[in-house]
Swiss-Prot record:
Region (Interaction with TCF3): 2-181, 147-356
Pfam families recorded: GCIP_C, GCIP_N
Region: Interaction with RPLP0, residue numbers: 2-187, 236-356
Oligomeric and partner information: Interacts with CCND1 and GRAP2. May also interact with COPS5, RPLP0, SIRT6, SYF2 and TCF3.
Originating gene: Ccndbp1
Organism placement in taxonomy: Eukaryota, Metazoa, Chordata, Craniata, Vertebrata
Protein name: Cyclin-D1-binding protein 1
Similarity field: Belongs to the CCNDBP1 family.
Region described as Required for interaction with CCND1: spans on this chain: 2-205
Length: 356
């Protein structure tokens, strides 16, 4: 005769439930990275979208606090209570992802990337918090320390700061690009002024030169003959520095045009400007790195050509877009001419290396 007593479902111990949830959240990350916007016949309601996203972020932040409060010290909650808490975390995380998917592509790819990155930071932050909590009791971690430093709370608090339209998103990304190139330009200028690109690194190492003189090769430090520019190198650096300066000027001008003339509904053109401008900073970095001794002139030539190609394309895309109401303005042709002049000079100085 079958027992009339209902079977009690088996629940894994709290530790296993948290570990499983962390793995589950990690598995969501690739899906969020490549996820497409949901197709819907309903008209997009921007105000409702941002309200839902902010509310979802607040919910996740609250669940992070609940997790921290219950699992940062022993005794842990029962398996049943752990199951309930984990389910609330799942629901909160799923809501963030669902809201992100509800943002249509026609609102702008740049804006969608910012919202996607925010969602990724939140999911990743929650997974990190779970992983920290798995070891917290044995390390006697204080609740206050966990709450103040867990990255999911930081990510949630950043959600209200996300730009609300594609023009604002484009300006944010262009500002970041300007700042990155500004830093690279200033770093390069300082190295040129000091004529000693490895001054900080080598000064530190020279203090221990007696005991570590044989270790330079192992540590990757440049030997003395490779730590300074030759006369040929210094001559080549001049047009390279001018090219980086032109990159900075171009990005600043593009950002100004977008700020003054950009239209929120011209999302495709704004996305194109941001996409090509995003390539400038990495190309500048490659060029700056290539001029550190020992300098390979062929590498400098290749890095310069790549940067010039990206720069001219960015200027041409900007000139052809709605942010340039007067395409005949002279600043774009002037910048293109300056860039071409730099490249021609670099080609002349690296011709021998190219022929080898």
């Amino acid at each position: 005769m079958a027992s009339s007593t209902a079977a009690v479902p088996f629940l894994a111990p709290p530790l296993e439930q948290l570990r499983h949830l962390a793995e589950e959240l990690r598995s969501l990350l690739p899906r969020v990275r490549v996820g497409e916007a949901q197709e819907t016949a309903e008209e997009f309601n921007r105000e409702m979208f941002w309200r839902r996203l902010n509310e979802a972020a607040v919910k996740v932040n609250g669940e992070a606090t609940v997790l921290t409060t219950h699992f940062s010290k022993l005794p842990w909650p029962s398996p049943q209570e752990t199951q309930r808490i984990c389910e609330q975390v799942r629901i909160a995380i799923e809501e963030i992802i669902i809201v992100y998917y509800s943002l249509p592509k026609d609102q702008g790819i740049t804006l969608r990337k910012l919202v996607r990155n925010a969602a990724l930071d939140i999911v990743d932050g929650m997974a990190q918090l779970l992983e920290v909590l798995l070891t917290a009791p044995s390390q006697s971690t204080e609740n206050g320390d966990l709450i103040s430093c867990n990255s999911v709370s930081v990510a949630c608090q950043q959600v209200p700061e996300i730009p609300k339209d594609n023009k604002a998103a484009a300006l944010l990304m262009l500002t970041k690009s300007v700042d990155f190139v500004k830093d690279a330009h200033e770093e390069m200028e300082q190295a040129v002024e000091e004529c000693d690109p490895y001054s900080g690194l080598l000064n530190d190492s020279e203090d221990n030169s007696d005991s570590h003189s044989d270790e330079d090769g192992v540590l990757g430090l440049p030997s003395n003959r490779d730590s300074y520019w030759s006369e040929e190198d210094q001559e080549l650096i001049i047009p390279c520095l001018a090219l980086v300066r032109a990159s900075r000027a171009s990005l600043k001008k593009i950002r100004i045009l977008v700020a003054e003339n950009g239209k929120k509904d011209e999302v495709a053109q704004l996305d194109d400007i941001v996409d090509i401008s995003d390539e400038i900073s990495p190309s500048v970095d490659d060029l700056v790195l290539s001029i550190y001794p020992p300098v390979c002139h062929l590498t400098v030539r290749i890095s310069s050509a790549k940067l010039v190609s990206v720069l001219i394309k960015a200027l041409e895309i900007t000139k052809a877009s709605h942010v340039s109401p007067h395409p005949g303005d002279s600043w774009i042709p002037l910048l293109i001419n300056a860039v071409d002049h730099c490249m021609n000079r670099i080609k002349a100085l690296t011709q021998r290396a190219a022929e080898l």
